[in-house]
């Protein structure tokens, strides 16, 4: 007979919370408890099924394994209790070993954890690239004991509790649970005479200074991997990696979109009407001339080719887009007001074609609407 889905057994959905699952388990357990159903074989079977479902789904790692493999996660290796315990350990290693950075034998060499470092740079540094110096605390292999954790001349002995496996099995109900050995804490060995420098850990914490090359063109979220610069491994295992995540500080003038840069430049009303030339600064610290054409409207963009950001690990370069923002004059003198009034009197549809066309279209729209 095929096993029922564990979520179905408890009467919960796959997205239920731990609290919801606990309430459902208590309700079902009370309903089918053998003491409440004496002599009822079906109740006994139901109760065992409920208990098995809850024992699996209430444990985060087991639940992840069940969601991924289903009942097959617990049936590998012959279906017996020993098969269950060993298969679960293997599955948990597959699921979580890489994340924790501890793949390998249970009491053998273990890889050190990866480290993450967040680095914030300026847009100019992202443009030019830089050689950055990092000082960070990290675990390194203890030189005094060469990572063994034992004092010079002493050797660790096999843990008598787990027999060097680093894990022990405990019987719970009709199945077994495998857990980390409480005596050796998963090492598989006991250090009777620990190294004084590291206290038996095999690693010590030190500050290290590293030089990191930030290449031109890095963007927010760029990840730089320094292999072997993470935490030291244990029992002779390799060191983890150091991952540097780069972010860019907001710039007061430029906004970035990929390799392109955008900049808003205010121009006067007369510059917009008559045309002219403005000088802008580019990201490389140089100056560039931008020709403003006659009749430029606010929001119009002018492109300066190859004045943007370099493309990471490429010879390509983005562009710089200058967006003109027409500034309306303020605090006018009497003479300026008179001149603007004269200009307005001389204005026609030709001088303001967009406005004239807009109001003409609006008038036609509402006249046609009222005539329907």
UniProtKB/Swiss-Prot annotation:
Domain J positions: 5-70
Pfam families (alphabetical): DnaJ, DnaJ_C, DnaJ_CXXCXGXG
UniProt-annotated binding residues for Zn(2+) 2: 159, 162, 181, 184
Gene Ontology molecular function terms on file: ATP binding; heat shock protein binding; unfolded protein binding; zinc ion binding
Keywords linked to the UniProt accession: Chaperone, Cytoplasm, DNA replication, Metal-binding, Repeat, Stress response, Zinc, Zinc-finger
A Gene Ontology BP annotation from the UniProt entry: protein refolding
Binding-site positions, Zn(2+) 1: 142, 145, 195, 198
UniProt zinc finger (CR-type) residues: 129-207
Predominant cellular place of this UniProt entry's protein: cytoplasm
Keyword Chaperone: yes
PROSITE patterns registered for this protein in UniProt: DNAJ_1, DNAJ_2, ZF_CR
Cofactor: Zn(2+)
InterPro entries noted in UniProt: DnaJ, DnaJ_C, DnaJ_domain, DnaJ_domain_CS, HSP40/DnaJ_pept-bd, HSP_DnaJ_Cys-rich_dom, HSP_DnaJ_Cys-rich_dom_sf, J_dom_sf
Annotated CXXCXGXG motif repeat ranges: 142-149, 159-166, 181-188, 195-202
One cellular-component annotation, GO: cytoplasm
Family: Belongs to the DnaJ family.
Record note on quaternary structure: Homodimer.
Protein's job: Participates actively in the response to hyperosmotic and heat shock by preventing the aggregation of stress-denatured proteins and by disaggregating proteins, also in an autonomous, DnaK-independent fashion. Unfolded proteins bind initially to DnaJ; upon interaction with the DnaJ-bound protein, DnaK hydrolyzes its bound ATP, resulting in the formation of a stable complex. GrpE releases ADP from DnaK; ATP binding to DnaK triggers the release of the substrate protein, thus completing the reaction cycle.
PANTHER family: CHAPERONE PROTEIN DNAJ (PTHR43096:SF48), DNAJ HOMOLOG 1, MITOCHONDRIAL-RELATED (PTHR43096)
Notes concerning its domains: The J domain is necessary and sufficient to stimulate DnaK ATPase activity. Zinc center 1 plays an important role in the autonomous, DnaK-independent chaperone activity of DnaJ. Zinc center 2 is essential for interaction with DnaK and for DnaJ activity.
Protein name: Chaperone protein DnaJ
């Amino acid at each position: 007979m095929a096993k029922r889905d564990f979520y179905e057994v408890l009467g919960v959905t796959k997205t239920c919370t731990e609290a919801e699952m606990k309430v459902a388990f208590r309700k079902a357990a009370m309903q089918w408890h053998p003491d409440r159903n004496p002599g009822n074989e079906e109740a006994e079977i139901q109760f065992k099924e409920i208990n098995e479902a809850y024992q699996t789904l209430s444990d985060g790692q087991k639940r992840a394994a069940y969601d991924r493999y289903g009942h097959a996660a617990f049936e590998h290796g012959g279906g017996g209790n020993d098969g269950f315990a060993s298969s679960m350990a293997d599955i948990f290693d597959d699921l979580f070993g890489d994340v924790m950075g501890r793949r390998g034998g249970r009491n053998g060499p273990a890889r050190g954890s990866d480290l993450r470092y967040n680095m914030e740079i300026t847009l100019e540094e992202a443009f030019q690239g830089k050689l950055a110096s990092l000082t960070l605390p990290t675990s390194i292999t203890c030189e005094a004991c060469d990572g063994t954790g034992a004092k010079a001349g002493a050797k660790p002995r096999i843990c008598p509790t787990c027999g060097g496996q680093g894990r022990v099995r405990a019987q719970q109900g009709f199945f077994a649970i495998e857990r980390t050995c409480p005596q050796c804490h998963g090492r598989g060995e006991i250090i009777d005479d620990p190294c004084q420098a590291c206290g038996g850990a095999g690693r010590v914490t030190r500050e290290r200074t590293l030089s990191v090359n930030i290449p031109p063109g890095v963007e927010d979220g760029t990840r730089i991997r320094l292999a072997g610069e993470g935490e030291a491994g244990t029992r002779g295992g390799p060191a983890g990696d150091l991952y540097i995540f780069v972010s860019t500080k907001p710039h007061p003038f430029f906004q970035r979109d990929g390799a392109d840069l955008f900049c808003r430049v205010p121009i006067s009303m007369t510059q917009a009407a008559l045309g002219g030339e403005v000088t802008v600064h580019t990201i490389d610290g140089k100056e560039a001339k931008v020709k403003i054409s006659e009749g430029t409207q606010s929001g119009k963009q002018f492109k300066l080719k190859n004045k943007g950001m370099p493309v990471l690990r490429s010879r390509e370069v983005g562009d710089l887009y200058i967006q003109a923002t027409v500034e309306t004059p303020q605090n006018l003198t009497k003479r300026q007001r008179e001149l603007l009034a004269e200009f307005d009197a001389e204005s026609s549809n030709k001088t303001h074609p967009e406005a004239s066309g807009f109001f003409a279209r609006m008038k036609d729209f509402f006249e046609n609407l009222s005539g329907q």
